[in-house]
Regions:
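Lectin-like carbohydrate-binding module/patch detector with strong preference for beta-trefoil
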Residues: 547-665
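Bacterial N-terminal signal peptides that target proteins for export
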Residues: 1-10
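Polar low-complexity intrinsically disordered regions enriched in Ser/Thr and small residues
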Residues: 5, 14, 252, 346, ...
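Residue-level detector of alpha-helical transmembrane segments in integral membrane proteins
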Residues: 12-13, 40
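Short alpha-helical "patches" and their helix-cap loops
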Residues: 5, 532-541, 607-608, 646-651
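Carbohydrate-active catalytic/glycan-binding domains of CAZyme proteins
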Residues: 22-552, 611-615
Length: 665
């Protein structure tokens, strides 16, 4: 979670609030009746969500990682529990096993459609180079069966209609429709046709619904400004109308980070570009209703090196369209808002336990293999209490088999792995990687002369080394997914750490279609003999907590880049008054900041009401944004110094004056 920051305002050093204890992992639930997006601060891409009775279920893309297609369950849409993987492994040839120089990077299994019908859970999902696959189970916990469909249906979505017919839509821009056969594994003869022409402006990543007799299809547009075009019709035969603004441009102020275009070294990495709003915006998702009659939206957004994240949005129906967001700010989702009223409550928890001492006889659900693993070449039993990875031949980490990873966690986290290198043989390499392309790692190399610490960075092509006398070593990666940089350290006693190598730039690209994975690896660079093994005693993942709202404290506010604090009638310090649900009033001299009918903000005397209440939120990089409860818009300071409650949301470049930094007085 985000860290308790020392905020610097116009040259001042800010006073820090008390930092709460470190927590195990990001939780969207704030514990005060609100939640903060994303639902998980680790990659969960191409989400699809259903409700079955009082339970909600969620799955998403896993590409080449095994096991795949996680199934999560929730009662409140905010706190999710891992239930199962629908796919233990998908072994459809050498490329799925990293054999014969082949791989499935950027491919694999993706864009699942989750449905429940007549007592059976269905997940339809695409596989590159194969036909669409259908997974079925009578319980979300499994067991799941797999059957290939006879066609490949790009980014499909399935609707079990109330007349007994089963429709499937798929495609990019040009949307096609057909009926599925009774066994759901083929298209009905003569039923395929184009439903919506490319010129209508639909994207891909479809979600197909029938609501109150009307048909809806949500889609994902990823060119330039990302958004979610939605089509609707009274009948399947049309006419279909398309709305481009149901969810558009909501990036929570996040700009484009480092990007990589080349697939092989030397890698061309472009620097961050905050001047392009909407390039990280929410764009692929759908909607779901609650037992109480509310509607909520879910959608993924590109969040740079950490991967694509899933966000939750209140839905406001206007003129028959399910807009993400709130009245008077349609299409723009609040990052922090009141939790859904589902009629149920859940304790605060995360889906996974990230730290692992490998004491169990099975891998924890957080772990996934890079491609199909080689059974018999890894173990939790050969030496109880450790993960043993046998070194298999590979020229480098990209080609190494049995690399075990977990999705990296943002916005800032530290991963520490404990390695016993005594089992390595000359030519073996083992360690901790920030795996993507380009990747970086810190580890131990064994040569004929002994052990050496090494740190390699694929971005720069540089390797750094240090002598190692011990066989036991602690390997650490400090990750900042706001700046998208990382650094590596090591220790020989578990207490004192030394840096190795230069800071690593974590770039995002479509080479893997994934974010960074914190990964444990062991491979062998020689082929003259069988390799040894690496024993990992433990992995510890720690995160820095989000700052608390400074209730009861006097603060000053300033716009980044401006030299003076905000002033209202000469008042520059405001007491933060707790209004409940993460909302505040800002009080000074017996008055409160208040939003007038013209949306101009001024200091008004009297008690605080809706016009004086603001939802306290933060951008991903920790700047404060304040949403007026009266206008559902955000405060911004215009170039002349006036403050207005009329911003749809902060821009990534910060030039709109809609983000603030604060310090305690």
């Amino acid at each position: 979670m985000g860290r308790q920051r020392l905020v610097s305002l116009f040259g001042w050093a800010a006073l820090a609030l008390a930092t709460p204890a470190l927590v195990q992992t990001w939780k969207a639930d704030n514990g005060n009746g609100t939640y903060t997006n994303p639902l998980f601060f680790d990659e969960f891409s191409d989400p699809d969500m259903i409700r079955v009775g009082n339970d909600f279920y969620l799955t998403g893309t896993t590409m080449h990682s095994m096991p795949g297609l996680p199934v999560l369950r929730s009662r409140d849409l905010v706190n999710w529990t891992f239930v199962s993987y629908a796919l233990d492994r998908l072994d459809l040839g050498p490329s799925f096993r990293l054999e014969d120089g082949k791989n499935e990077y950027g491919r694999g299994i993706w864009a699942p459609c989750f449905r429940f019908h007549d007592g059976t859970y269905h997940i339809f999902s695409n596989v590159n180079g194969q036909t669409t696959q259908l997974f079925r189970a009578t319980s979300p916990a499994g067991p799941w069966t797999r059957a290939p469909i006879k066609r490949s249906l790009h980014d499909l979505s399935v609707l079990f209609d109330d007349d007994g017919k089963v429709h499937v839509v798929w495609g990019y821009q040009g949307i096609h429709i057909a009926q599925l056969t009774e066994d759901l594994t083929d298209l009905g003869p003569g039923t395929e046709r184009e439903l919506i022409a490319p010129a209508a402006g639909m994207g891909e990543g479809l979600h197909f619904y029938k609501i109150d007799g009307k048909y809806f299809i949500t889609s994902a547009w990823f060119i330039d400004e990302m958004r979610m075009p939605v089509a609707r019709a009274d009948r399947l035969g049309g006419p279909w109308e398309v709305n481009q603004d149901v969810s558009r441009g909501e990036d929570f102020g996040l700009g484009v980070g480092y990007r990589v275009g080349s697939r092989e070294a030397p890698f061309h990495v472009t620097p961050p570009d905050p001047s392009r709003p909407g390039r990280c915006a929410m764009h692929q998702g759908g909607i779901v209703d609650t037992p109480t009659g509310e509607w909520w939206g879910f959608s993924m957004m590109d969040a740079n090196a950490v991967g694509r994240l899933t966000a939750l949005s209140p839905v406001t129906w206007v003129d028959g369209w399910p807009y993400f967001g709130l009245p008077d700010n349609l299409g723009r989702s609040p990052r922090t808002w009141v939790k859904p009223n589902t009629g149920a409550t859940e304790p605060l928890h995360a889906p996974y336990q990230r730290s692992d001492d490998f004491a169990a006889h099975r891998l924890q659900p957080i772990w996934q293999w890079n491609h199909v693993p080689v059974d018999g070449k890894w173990s939790l039993r050969e030496r109880p209490g450790v993960l043993r990875l046998h070194a298999l031949p590979a020229p480098d980490l990209w080609h190494a088999r049995n690399t075990l990873g977990q999705r990296a966690i943002g916005p800032r986290s530290t991963v520490t792995a404990t390695l016993d290198a005594s089992g390595l043989k000359p030519g073996d390499v083992a360690g901790l990687a920030l795996f993507n392309r380009p990747y970086a790692w810190i580890g131990v190399e064994r040569s004929d002369d002994g052990l050496t610490l090494a740190q390699l960075d694929e971005v720069t092509g540089k390797a750094s080394r240090a002598p190692l006398q011990n066989t036991r070593v602690w390997l650490r990666a400090d990750c900042d997914f706001v700046k998208n940089t990382a650094s590596f350290h090591y220790s020989t006693d578990g207490a004192t750490y030394a840096a190795l190598g230069e800071p690593h730039v974590m770039a995002y690209g479509l080479i893997t279609f994934q974010g960074v994975r914190s990964s444990l690896f062991s491979y062998r660079t020689r082929s003259d003999a069988e390799g040894g093994y690496a024993d990992f005693d433990a992995i510890e993942v720690t995160e820095v907590p989000r700052p608390a709202v400074p209730y009861g404290r006097r603060i000053e506010l300033a716009v980044p880049g401006r030299t003076s604090p905000l002033a209202f009638d000469e008042a520059v310090a405001f007491t933060v008054v707790d209004r409940g649900l993460g909302r505040v009033a800002l009080e000074a001299d017996g008055g409160h900041l208040s939003v007038g009918q013209d949306r101009v903000v001024s200091l008004r005397r009297g008690t605080a009401g809706e016009a004086e209440t603001f939802q306290w939120m933060e951008t991903f990089d920790g700047d404060l944004v304040l949403m007026s409860l009266a206008t559902k818009r955000y405060l911004r300071c215009d170039p002349g110094g006036r403050v207005l409650a009329d911003s749809p949301g902060p821009r990534p470049d910060g030039q709109d004056g809609a983000r603030f930094r604060w310090r305690v007085r």
